[in-house]
Design a protein with these regions (language model features):
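Intrinsically disordered, low-structural-confidence terminal and linker regions
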Residues: 1-49
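N-terminal signal-anchor module of multipass membrane proteins
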Residues: 60-62, 84-85
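N-terminal amphipathic alpha-helix/helix-capping segment at the start of soluble metabolic enzymes
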Residues: 64-77
Length: 402
């Protein structure tokens, strides 16, 4: 939704200090250098950040704690994690048909995975906040500032559109809030109904050229549903689902503005990033002493970190020690994005070192970003067979390593 936002001319007052112990850690984190940040006026950005500090959160701590419990099941082999969504959301595409389509696809995939693996599937959408993009250069081939996502600037190739505008953070917040509200409505009002999802999968089998290979599986699922219906199974869990939201915690001013105090399951006061249920640190911003890694170490959310082909076992253990100091199963997700030609050689010693260190992390495959190349027309793309090869390599390694 392409809303315009009027930013108050007068700055809002600062928030009161955080409780002792948390304030010192917070100050240490925000004073650290952050890579991949916009070149906007910091005084204006500070004013916008103070607006974000006063708005209602997008998610709440009890939802975050619910996700943490489910990720603990994933880390201990009792559940499967499925994450999907847009590489980068846009304000223009943040509408009901697009969001419904993404959620419907995620739920359809979850049904097949749940049946095939006989395992609960934790559904994590890349939605309601994935508005920032890291870039390899500040400017494009035409000398314009590179597009860094709708939260920073516009994609149109003009000087004005590419200007870094901190007011866009409020637009990103408004769009994220609207998206998360719709996700909650969809998953509790029929879209997540198990019988409807199966019918949509049936339509895929009937209408897709690739559908024939899945017909036997669809028949098995249908037989299972018919059996439950005959037994009178009609629980609310068959008609609703929990979908959690996630994004890369890239933009320092935005993530800082969405921090709130809350309590965990044990009644301990913590800082939470209430822009999402889970946030992760990208491959380009994972400096151990920099802002991003130390920010996610500060918060009570479950967190992730992308590990590219340059990662070493020693580095991976350092990340585990910093981001999972209490050794909570599932608190940390390590996301392998190594490329199909590297995953089988780089990942095994990393898994071995982390497991031997006593951390029970979620191991996740991102087969998209390590297999990117630039086509002759200038567009970045991937070969599907290489994506599939990395996924297959990843799962073979997990079965032999864990």
């Amino acid at each position: 939704m392409s809303w315009t936002i009027d930013i108050p001319n007068e700055a809002l007052p600062d928030l009161p200090p955080l409780p002792d112990g948390i304030e010192e850690k917070f100050r240490d984190v925000v004073d650290r250098p952050a890579k991949q940040q916009p070149s906007w006026d910091q005084a204006q950005a500070d004013n916008v950040r103070k607006i974000l500090e006063s708005v209602p959160p997008i998610v709440v701590p009890p939802e975050i704690q619910s996700l943490k419990r489910k990720l603990a099941a994933v880390a201990t082999g009792r559940a499967f994690l499925l994450q999907g969504g847009d590489c980068a959301e846009t304000f223009e595409s943040n509408n009901e048909p697009h969001i419904r389509g993404n959620i419907k696809t995620l739920l359809q995939m979850a049904v097949v995975l749940t049946y095939g693996a006989s395992t609960p599937v934790v559904k994590l959408a890349r939605i309601a906040g994935q508005y920032a993009k890291p870039r390899s250069a500040d400017r494009d081939g035409n000398g314009l500032l590179n597009y860094r996502g709708d939260i920073v600037n516009g994609v149109e190739p003009t000087e004005e559109a590419r200007r870094h505008d901190p007011a866009r953070m409020v637009r990103a917040y408004a769009n994220s809030s609207a998206a998360m509200n719709l996700v909650r409505s969809l998953t509790s009002s029929g879209t997540a109904d198990l019988y409807s999802l199966h019918e949509w999968n049936r339509e895929f089998v009937s209408n897709s050229r690739a559908g024939a290979r899945y017909e036997a599986l669809a028949n098995e699922i249908e037989a299972g549903l018919n059996f439950m219906s005959a037994c009178g199974v009609n629980d609310d869990t068959l008609r609703s689902a929990d979908i959690y939201c996630s994004h890369e915690a890239l933009l320092k001013d935005y993530e800082r503005g969405m921090l709130r105090l809350g309590q965990d399951d044990r009644g301990h006061t913590k800082l939470y990033d209430l822009s999402a249920h889970q946030v992760w640190v990208g491959e380009r911003t994972r400096g151990l002493e920099d802002f991003h890694v130390n920010f996610v170490a500060l918060i009570g959310n479950p967190v992730g970190i992308k590990l590219g082909p340059g990662i070493t076992p020693e580095e991976a253990v350092e990340y585990a020690e910093k981001l999972d100091p209490l050794r909570e199963p599932g608190h940390l997700t390590m996301i392998a994005r190594m490329g199909h030609d590297k995953v089988r050689t780089v990942l095994p010693p990393v898994i071995k070192a982390v497991e031997e260190s006593g951390h029970k992390v979620v191991w996740q495959s991102d087969p998209m970003h390590g297999n990117t190349f630039t086509a002759s027309n200038g567009y970045k793309t991937r070969h599907f067979d290489k994506i599939l090869d990395e996924v297959q390599g990843f799962f073979c390694l997990l079965y032999t390593s864990l």
